[in-house]
Amino acid sequence: MVHAAVLLVATACLAVFGVMLIMNKRRHIAQWTYLMIPLTLAEGLLSLALQGLGVNLIGPAIQLVVLIALHVTADPSLREERRLQFALRRMDARSAYEDAASQGMAGRDLTGKGYISLDFFNLFWLFAIGCVFGLVIETIYHFILFGEYQDRAGFLWGPFSPIYGFGVVIVTVLLNHLWQSNWLLIFCSSAVIGGAFEYFTSWFMQAAFGIRAWDYTGQWLSIDGRTSGKYMFFWGVLGLVWVKLILPRLLRLIQRIPWKIRYSLTLVCFILIFVDGVMTLMALDAWYSRMAGVAQNSPVSQFFATYFNDDFMAHRFQTMKIDPSTAGRM
């Protein structure tokens, strides 16, 4: 039902978008891409959850690439921004950065509307650091609570828990304009955002791969066992501490990455984490297929069965319990 609704909305928006392309309304085209890109991402995630990894994702992937290309090329202000950025790189990009750094404004939103500049460089490093420190905090919390160490990583390789990385990015983006607001508003907003994100993540993992990584059934304000009042409270506290205390200090730390290597280092790290994420999704899909009794005849499935077999997956993802019968695939 949800997938059908998203497809219906996306199709209607795509029709309007096509008319705008024909009429060459560049400014409106650029604005509509802000709506179409999230819809396309939602369509792709729902398709992955309900049908798994396959040719069903080719359409959303191509559409996403086209939308991003149109977004960048259709908006005259973005073209002007690219020209300006190119000129700055040629003339005085470094001096401009050093000037901003000397005023304590490196990485900041210079418009004053938000605290942090929501550019790729900042958001990527917030994601990466959130993945690592989120894993550390959760591991310590589990050890204190149960007196045992448990590997709570969410990627095939590295000390990464992507739910915290994405959580950090989502909270940062949605609360960026509230950084000067009172603590109660930030706390409540973060609690709702975190709870909704946790619910969706739990639903997606179960629908796509039959995996439950947590179950809060029986807790206060439990919603299908996917989130609860207790953990929404934790999200609220973490969001408040993040916006008021951690983000300003972390931004200053990120901006200390040397100018000469910051973009090359970011690109290399992004590629490594992106490959890690894609391989993780493929390994989870192969794990689901094996547990569901699907024949592993393709070279790809045989590769994952050899190098990322059931024992490896169970040991690596110790918090995950897989039951293909609970998946929502069609």
Q: Which residue stretches match the model-derived regions?
A:
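Aromatic-rich, lipid-facing transmembrane alpha helices and their immediate juxtamembrane interface loops
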Residues: 2-330
